[in-house]
Amino acid sequence: DFRLFTMDNVAEEIAFRARVIRDCDTKPVIAHAWGGGAITCAQLGGMAFDDWKNAKVFDKWGFSAFPRDAKSASTLAMGCDATRCAADGKEFWQSELTAGMWGTGLHQGGRMDDDTFLNLSLESIRHGAKGLLYWQFRKERFGAEFGGYAMTDYDGGPTNLSRCAGRLGEMLKRNGDVLSAGALPRAEVAVLFSIRSYLAVWLSNGRHENKAAIDAVNGYYRVLWEENIPVDILHEEFFGDLSGYRLIILPCACAVSPAFAEALKTYIAGGGTVLSDPYFGAFDKDMQLSYAVPGYGFAEIFGAREDDIREGDAREIVYRSETHRVTGLLMNETFRDVAADALATYADGTPAILSHKWGRGRAILSGVSLGNSCAEGALISDDILADGQNRQSTLARRVVLDLCADCGVRPNPCDAPGVKASVYETDDGNGCVILINSAAEPAEGRVRLNASYAACSEELGAPHASLADNALRFRLAPHESAVVRLLAKR
């Protein structure tokens, strides 16, 4: 309760400050969240801030992020989507992106290469950021961060990073009309951010950190991100109408709010599909242990009750006749009173993932924490170090993508593995495509377009772009990023 009170107290304090500023000036009041935002804060119990509550009082919103390398790109993207959703239609900026140099004092990590700098910058843009601010121009001369985080040399002279930022800035000037006004596809999949569950994880261990909760969310998000499937991040208090989503994923929902649990019942009854981690609703509205798990009456909806639960690191699970060894698990749950179908089983034949029809919808309950089994393991702040475990679970990937296909979610528009693609389209018939090759090998493929265009022009990079059959053909070097302008037919 004290942590939730602190979040409310912070929100009230910044609302007061915003009112004072507005009493003195008519210009927009702008602020941003620290270190990746609440969804990637591993010390959320200690810092106790809620982006959704804080963003409400400002005219524009943003967040800061300090990814160390391109391997942190999915965590950066997740932070961007969370910030976009917290802004709730307001313009949001990437307000403090690393300028490309990591480290301070005598512990320097050196400058990023151009490919990594462009990757992280364009990742922010393609997830909704309408502007980029970097920390910072020159190296600090004193203080805890002396010598670090600079885009320029000691005296403000040019580096590869400042030159790269210049090229990126020129591209944004030429194409800002499309990137600002162009529409991205609406998200058909949503991932829950349960801030109460983050706090439960933070309080439940002696380390006072909630890294496992971040990994739970990131693992699911990463599977979708790798397939260019747009995602909304749902806050358990500020979620609106759920009926537009084909699939809602519930990572680390042990203390999900009662209001969201009730909304889920309506969503499933109306034909929606949910996929939940184990231990759903284990804590009630007062954060006391529930009398039954799943909580909030969801045993009927999931078609089973929990029999036993324990921590675990590895399990063998059979899914569609294939055996998968799953590691990095936070929870292992077994079931009783099972009325649901077994979507997957443990090695002993008992149900591991349950699927149950309820109303006109479908509720899937996993006995293992699928998100934790495929998390990037990265943080984009400096609160604690990541554990370095970058996991890739074929089971999690298959389950999530099979569910997306079953629910009719729009498939990946790009046929080149490892390439991230975003298509912007405007009402006047113009467009832009952002391409990022995250692989260490060259990539060649096509991106499906929703309209036909007269021509295309290469605005950043050298992607060998051409148009054919309502698709953009491209060829990218390893780790290359590119932007292609699509020109309207007249």
Regions from the language model: what does each represent?
Residues 39-54, 243:
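Distinct, well-ordered alpha-helical segments
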Residues 1, 43-49, 206, 292-295:
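Aromatic- and acidic-residue-enriched segments that line the glycan-binding/catalytic groove
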Residues 15, 23, 27, 55, ...:
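Carbohydrate-binding surfaces of carbohydrate-active enzymes
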Residues 1-32, 45, 53-57:
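Active-site neighborhood of glycoside hydrolase catalytic domains
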